[in-house]
């Protein structure tokens, strides 16, 4: 699990943001765009759930959970040594999403 103790840096904007491992990247980087899009998708699904009934609701809950995992994967680059094992989207999750 990604551990974020705080959501601010007090370092000013300067067009940069921090990834889950502390690495600073441009806010317009493809990685930041990707996890922003994943987060927006998850938010839209959350709004859609309000008026849905099972089993569609249960399917969307599973998709949302997978999107949280994907966002965590995008937030922590694979090329850095971490003190913990990051989440990774696996083939089971991909196959299940494609079936649904």
Model-derived regions, located:
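Phosphate/pyrophosphate-binding loop motifs in nucleotide- or prenyl diphosphate-using proteins
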Residues: 1-100
